[in-house]
Amino acid sequence: MIIDTPEVQDINSFSRLEYLKEVYGIIWMLVPIFTPVLGITIGVLAIVWLEREISAGIQQRIGPEYAGPLGILQALADGTKLLFKENLLPSRGDTRLFSIGPSIAVISILLSYLIIPFGSNLVLSDLNIGVFLWIAISSIAPIGLLMSGYGSNNKYSFLGGLRAAAQSISYEIPLTLCVLSISLLSNSSSTVDIVEAQSKYGFWGWNLWRQPIGFIVFLISSLAECERLPFDLPEAEEELVAGYQTEYSGIKFGLFYVASYLNLLVSSLFVTVLYLGGWDLSIPYIFVPEFFEINKAGEVFGTTIGIFITLAKTYLFLFIPITTRWTLPRLRMDQLLNLGWKFLLPISLGNLLLTTSSQLLSL
């Protein structure tokens, strides 16, 4: 059988179309994966630059200014430098625990981004147990730090890992009780439902005004969970060299560096979602596209504005932990544990009882 030239061309074009369809299918599968990763990376770089600029202003010195415009690429330059440094392993340590520890710390924090809503329809996983899943996932990170400290075969590293575990346990309970109070107020543990419950009453419906005591306890507990000054005892330079990070170098040291800022960003995002109304601004911006007769863009416009509002609230709140790091002295270990067990735990329990009583009386 003889096949004409046009038929051969049609067959070739059809095969090329099938190949292109497969390529586009793979690309569209990868887009939802790489988009959050890119967003998180840019967010961390912005936090590092913001902290360096604020700390420079507090200390009356010049911040980074050579790597990129206004020094915004300095963190990227530091990360690139760490990539090319030698990865050292302790000769007498447990190399498996030493290598796995940083990965556990980073992955447990990255998983928390699954339940953070940037809009009513823009959340990777809207679960009924969203906020408690975050607490459960964040409890895994200290295990990685303890593994790193033990696997290093270094007394300073091991002591830093023990401090990280003790600090996490002490402040995880008040944090959980504050989240439980928010869940009772909103009648849901879903992060999307919590934001929508606040948006019903506008600006004065934010949980910041309905739960001021819980907000303060949550703020202090989240700072302790992030190991930020004045709660950075697991890596206190004057006492433990660098804590559980002492024996690390290269990319593994960089993972701890990234995990610290990832945790700070997650905590700030959850403060925005739980207490500051999330993507809600109490201004009817959704009617702007209708005013300009571009109704088809209304949903896209609303989603874009929601992302912008959430990030704006988050980065404005970041001024608090950044400022406290460069203005407050470090606590002693006994002071840190006393604050968690003797003050924050009873206060958070009392706040939970008040919230429960008010909810029962309102039935």
Swiss-Prot record:
Identify its membrane topology class. Answer: Multi-pass membrane protein
Q: Where in the cell is it found?
A: Plastid, Chloroplast thylakoid membrane
Q: What is its main location?
A: plastid
Transmembrane regions listed in the UniProt entry: 30-50, 98-118, 129-149, 248-268, 300-320, 336-356
**Which PANTHER family does the entry link to?**
NADH DEHYDROGENASE SUBUNIT 1, NADH-UBIQUINONE OXIDOREDUCTASE CHAIN 1
Q: Name one GO biological process term.
A: photosynthesis, light reaction
Q: Which family does it belong to?
A: Belongs to the complex I subunit 1 family.
Q: What does this protein do?
A: NDH shuttles electrons from NAD(P)H:plastoquinone, via FMN and iron-sulfur (Fe-S) centers, to quinones in the photosynthetic chain and possibly in a chloroplast respiratory chain. The immediate electron acceptor for the enzyme in this species is believed to be plastoquinone. Couples the redox reaction to proton translocation, and thus conserves the redox energy in a proton gradient.
User: What class does this enzyme belong to in the EC scheme?
Assistant: translocase
List the catalytic activities from the record.
Answer: a plastoquinone + NADH + (n+1) H(+)(in) = a plastoquinol + NAD(+) + n H(+)(out); a plastoquinone + NADPH + (n+1) H(+)(in) = a plastoquinol + NADP(+) + n H(+)(out)
Could you tell me the gene encoding this protein?
A: ndhA
Official protein name in the record: NAD(P)H-quinone oxidoreductase subunit 1, chloroplastic
Q: Which HAMAP family match?
A: NDH1_NuoH (MF_01350)
- GO terms assigned for molecular function: oxidoreductase activity, acting on NAD(P)H, quinone or similar compound as acceptor; quinone binding
Q: Which UniProt keywords apply?
A: Chloroplast, Membrane, NAD, NADP, Plastid, Plastoquinone, Quinone, Thylakoid, Translocase, Transmembrane, Transmembrane helix
Q: What is the lineage of its organism?
A: Eukaryota, Viridiplantae, Streptophyta, Embryophyta, Tracheophyta
Record-listed E.C. numbers = 7.1.1.-
**Gene Ontology terms: cellular component:** chloroplast thylakoid membrane
Q: Does the UniProt entry include the keyword Plastid?
A: yes
Report which superkingdom the organism of origin falls in.
Answer: Eukaryota
Q: How does it assemble?
A: NDH is composed of at least 16 different subunits, 5 of which are encoded in the nucleus.
